[in-house]
Amino acid sequence: MFFKKYFLKEKIKQNSYFIWNNENKNIQIIKKFKLLDLDLIIGVDSQKEILLKNTINFAKGNFSNNALLWGARGNGKSSLIKSVFHNVLSKNKNLKLIQLNKNNMFDIEYIYSILGQYEEYRFIIFIDDLSFEKIDSDYKIIKST
C-alpha cells in the first residue's frame, strides 16, 4: 500500500492531465493532451471570461462555482475547458485536471477520497459528454457529493 500511495503522489506531483481508469481504480497520465490556444476560441467571449475567472479563483483556493457547459455536440465545450485549464495552469502549478467518463460517475466518491489526501493540489474533475435523458438518474450521484 505504501508503494502505491508513494507512486500516486509522484505521478500527481509530476503531471497535470489525468484520466480515471475504471479497471484499476486509479488515475492514468494523459501524455498527449490536445489543446487549442484560448485566443482561437471565438464566439463565446463572455462564457470564456467567466470560466477563466472562476478557474483562477478555484486554483487560488478562493470562492468558485462548479461549471456546467451545455450545447450541441462539436461546439467546443471540451476545447474551452482544456484551454482555460492550460491557461490557468501556467501560473498555478497546483492545478490538476482529471477526466472522468460518464460511465464512471459511480466512482466519484472513491475518487474524492483519493484526491482528498493531496490537499496541496486543486483538482478539476471534468466529465465529458455528459447528457441527461428523462429516464437517466445517474447524474444524481454528483448532486449529492
Predicted segments, located by residue:
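Dynamic helix-loop-helix/coil hinge segments at AAA+ ATPase domain boundaries and subdomain interfaces
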Residues: N26-I50
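A conserved segment at the C-terminal end of the G1
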Residues: K82-H86
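Phosphate-binding P-loop
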Residues: I30-K32, I56-S64
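Substrate-gripping "pore-loop 1 plus following alpha2 helix"
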Residues: D136-T145
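Walker A/P-loop nucleotide-binding motif
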Residues: G61-I81
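Pre-Walker A adenine-sensing motif
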Residues: S46-K60
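AAA+/P-loop NTPase substrate/partner-engagement loops
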Residues: I41, N87-R122, D129-I135
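Interdomain "pre-motor" coupling segment immediately N-terminal to P-loop NTPase/helicase cores
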Residues: M1-I29
